Design a protein with these regions (language model features):
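Conserved DHp (HisKA) dimerization/phosphotransfer helix of two-component histidine kinases, i.e.
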Residues: 1-40
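Short conserved segment of the HATPase_c
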Residues: 104-116
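Detector for a conserved hydrophobic position within an alpha-helical segment of the HATPase_c
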Residues: 135-136
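Glycine-rich ATP-binding loops of the HATPase_c
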Residues: 139-147
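Conserved catalytic submotifs in the C-terminal HATPase_c
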Residues: 40-52, 89
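Short beta-strand-loop-beta element adjacent to the nucleotide/active-site pocket used for signaling
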Residues: 82, 87-95
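Acidic ATP/Mg2+-coordinating residue in the GHKL
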Residues: 99
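Short alpha-helical Gxxx[C/S/T] motif in the catalytic ATP-binding
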Residues: 127, 131-132
Length: 166
């Protein structure tokens, strides 16, 4: 309950950003979620073996990862494979979350981030719009549907500018 309160208190206000290792924070969130998900979902986590520093708010970053993972699990109807892959470029880091779910039609790639858009029977369609707001407005990153194929799955991609520790 405290985590939820912390997250929502940061939305709408200017969150405090910290220079942190995005790999460690992402991995910790994924490991936490893995313990709370059906054994029918297999997780794969791949990342460089060294820290990559980005300016972000840890509670909000964790929430974006959690939302993307939960959406992926919903799309797979609770069973399938979930791959989280972090790659480093010269100035950026990319986080890709790939599922083996139902896929998203190409004409809905941008719509999935609109408030109120949902394909689920439950929910308000706010998760991805809040995720986009956190990634783009607060963390100055980018988020998109990188690839999706109906009946095969989807890859969501976030990218963030790297920073140096001073």
């Amino acid at each position: 309950l405290q985590t939820i309160t912390d997250r929502f208190s940061k939305i709408g206000s200017e969150p405090v950003l910290e220079k942190r290792d995005i790999i460690e924070d992402t991995k910790n969130t994924v490991e936490y979620l893995q313990t709370r998900v059906s054994q029918q979902v297999s997780f794969s986590f791949k990342a460089p073996q060294h820290p990559i520093y980005v300016e972000f708010n840890p509670a909000l970053h964790s929430w974006t990862i959690e939302n993307l993972v939960k959406n992926a699990i919903d799309a797979m109807k609770g069973k399938g494979a979930l791959n989280i892959n972090i790659t480093e470029l010269e100035n950026f880091v990319k986080i890709r979350i790939t599922d083996t779910g139902k896929g998203i039609p190409k004409n809905q790639f941008s719509k999935v981030f609109e408030p109120g858009f949902t394909t689920k029977k439950r929910g308000w369609g706010l998760g991805l719009s809040l995720t986009k707001r956190i990634v783009q407005e607060y963390h100055k990153g980018k988020i998109k549907v990188e690839h999706s194929e109906i009946g095969k799955g989807t890859t969501m991609q976030m990218s963030f500018k790297k920073t140096t520790i001073v």
